[in-house]
Amino acid sequence: MNIRHGIIAMSSTMLVPLAAEAACNTDYSWIDKSCERISDTWKNGDHDLYIPLWTHHLRFAYDNDKIDSFREFTWGLGYGRSRYNAAGNWEGVYLMAFSDSHSNVQPMLGYGHQWMMGPRSGLHAGVGYTAFLTSRADIYKNIPIPGVLPIASLNYRQYSVNTSYVPGGRGNGNILFFWSRVGF
C-alpha cells in the first residue's frame, strides 16, 4: 500500500458516520444500539489526535534475524472522536494509519471501549477492546480484514498512552503496539 492509498483511506473516514447513521434503522436491536453508540460518539465526541509510538515484537516468538529485520519504531498519524459515557467509560471512533514492521502503510478504522478506573481529572487507567478493519500488504494483499483486540491505557486528563496485544504463534503476532492519544 502506498501513501496515495493511505490518503484515500483516511479521506473516506468522513463518510463512516453518515453510513453508520443510515444503517442504524434495522430490525435488530443490538445492531441499532451499537450503531447509535458509534454515531453518537462521532457526532458528540471530542476531537482526538492519535500518534503511533512503538511496535514491540515479543522476543520469545522470533529468532534474532527476524527481529533485526523488523522496524519497531512506528511513524503515522490518526484522527478520532471520543467521549466518556454516562457510566464514566471511554468510547472512541478512530482512523489511524501507521507503518507496520516492514515499513508498509497500515490503515486502521475502528471503535474502542474502555472501562475506566480513577478520576478523569487526574491519573486514571482503562482496559477494554477495539473492534476494527485494517489491511496489510503481507496479509491477504491489502484486502480489508476485521479484528478485535484487547486495549489498555494510562491517562492524565486529555492525554493517554495506550497499548494493544496482538496474539500469535512462533514467528507471527505476539506484538505489543503502543500509541498516544491527545484530546482537544
From Swiss-Prot:
Gene3D superfamilies: 2.40.160.20. Residues 1-22 form the signal peptide. One of its GO terms (biological process) is lipid A biosynthetic process. It is found in: Cell outer membrane. The keyword Transferase applies. The record marks 66 as: Role in lipopolysaccharide recognition. HAMAP family: PagP_transferase. This is Lipid A acyltransferase PagP.
